[in-house]
A protein has these predicted regions:
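Structural core segment of the AMP-binding/adenylate-forming
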Residues: 101-157
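Conserved AMP-binding/adenylate-forming
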Residues: 50-55, 68-113, 123
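Structural motif detector for alpha-helix initiation sites
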Residues: 24, 56-57, 115
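Flexible, non-catalytic linker and terminal segments flanking ANL/adenylate-forming cores
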Residues: 1-28, 44
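Alpha-helical packing segments of well-folded alpha/beta enzyme cores
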Residues: 24-31, 63-67
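AMP-dependent adenylate-forming
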Residues: 28-55
Length: 157
């Protein structure tokens, strides 16, 4: 056992007591209040990764809550499920958190899936909303939508 592992094991009860009964939303809200202007997400500003765009904790929370408001208007409710098909971008992270703010469960689907595979997974998870990162993915999910029992909306980010 490494020294780090031993140390973490010795701190287990302290760590557990500090997070017990709290949710992800509790911690996002705390960070947005206590660390409002600190970076929460960093995204490459160019393909060479020589510059980065940052989004602060308060901007991240506000963007997720704004998306959640729209998702609720589309019918997403606590206990529902939604999926995201997108590159690993800040919009993907905002979408994931926005779904959580609705009280729904997010899932990420591989971008390489074709419409029949999307249909299968969407029906299996009873997805109510799909969030996609580009027009090509929108078209693929839209083909699957007609045979998806619960899928009510596709959101293009």
């Amino acid at each position: 056992m490494s020294k780090l592992h031993e140390y973490l094991k010795s701190q287990e009860s302290l760590i557990t007591s500090s997070v017990e009964g709290k949710t992800l939303i509790d911690f996002i809200n705390r960070n947005a209040e206590e660390y409002a202007d600190y970076p929460a997400l960093n995204t490459p500003a160019n393909s060479e990764y020589s510059a980065w765009d940052s989004m602060s904790w308060s901007e991240y929370r506000d963007a997720a809550k704004n998306l959640a408001s729209g998702l609720i208007d589309l019918g997403l409710s606590p206990g529902d499920t939604a999926f995201i098909m997108s590159n690993n971008t800040k919009e993907h992270n905002i979408s994931d958190l926005g779904i959580v703010y609705c009280g729904a469960t997010p899932s990420t689907l591989y971008k390489q899936l074709k419409y029949n595979q999307i249909e299968y997974v969407a029906n299996l998870m009873q997805a109510k909303v799909a969030i996609v990162g580009d027009l090509e993915l929108f078209e693929e999910v839209n083909k699957a939508k007609k045979d998806c029992i619960n899928l009510q909306a596709i959101v293009l980010i």
